[in-house]
C-alpha cells in the first residue's frame, strides 16, 4: 500500500521521474539562493523579478510558441533588463529600489499576460503562468540541471563575500572590492533560477521553491550553512510530496508542491527550535528530562 502510494508512481511512469529530477535540481539551485535573498531582506525583490521575466518569455512564446530556448532567452533578457532598470531608476530618482521593482513587476505582469493572450489560448496562458512540471521533456530537464550546476559553482566562488555582506556590508567595502561583483553575480543567479523555476512552476509560483524553504530553514538553524542544507532538504521533500499528492489526487502539480512547502512552513513557525511560537510560549520545556 505504501509502496503503491509513494514509490510506484516514480518507478512506473517516466514523466514522474523527470518531474522528480527537475524538483531535485530546482531545490539544489534555488533553495540556497532563497536563503541569501531572505538574509539580505530581498524576498519581495525575488518575487518581483519572478514576474518581471514574464514579458520576455511571452515574446519568445509569441515568436516561437512553446519553444524552450526562445522562452528561456526571453525570460533571461527580461529579468536582467528589469533588474538593471530598477537599479538605474532607484539611483537617479527619489524612488527606492523596492518601489521601482514593484512598478516594473506590475507592468511586466500585465504586459506578459497581454502578449500571451494575443497568440495563445487560455491553456497556453495557464502553462506560462503556472507551468506544468509533469509535462517536462528531456531538453527542459537538461537546461534546468545545467543552470543548477552553474548556480552551485558560482555560489561557491562568491559565497564568502555574500556571507560577509549579509553580516557587515560596510566591513566588506572596507577590506575588499568583491562586494559589487558578488552582488551582480548574485542577481544573475536569482534571474537564472527564476527562469529555471518558470519552466517547471510558471512565473506565478517560480519563487515558491526559493523563498518558502528559506523561511522554513530560518526556524531551525541560525548557521548559514545549516540553513542552506535545511532549505535544500525541505525544498526536495516539498517537491516529492507535492508530486505524490498531485498524482494521487489529480490536483495541479505546481500548486501542490507549493502548498506542501507552505504546510512545512506553518509547522516550522509553530514548532521550530529557533524562535518557533511553541518554543517562545514554553521556553523551559527543552530543559526538562
Predicted features along the sequence, with ranges:
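Helix-loop-helix "hairpin" substructures at the membrane interface of multi-pass membrane proteins
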Residues: 141-213
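Transmembrane alpha-helical segments in multi-pass inner-membrane proteins
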Residues: 204-255
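Short loop segments and helix-boundary regions at transmembrane helix junctions
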Residues: 35-50, 54-122, 217-229, 246-248, ...
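Hydrophobic alpha-helical transmembrane segments
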Residues: 20-25, 72-77, 99-103, 141-146, ...
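Transmembrane helix-bundle core of multi-pass membrane transporters
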Residues: 3-10, 93, 100-160
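Cytosolic-side transmembrane-helix boundaries in multi-pass membrane proteins
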Residues: 251-289
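Small-residue-rich segments of transmembrane alpha-helices in multi-pass membrane proteins
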Residues: 52-60, 103-115, 135-136, 179-189, ...
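Membrane-interfacial amphipathic/re-entrant helices at transmembrane-helix boundaries
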Residues: 1-28
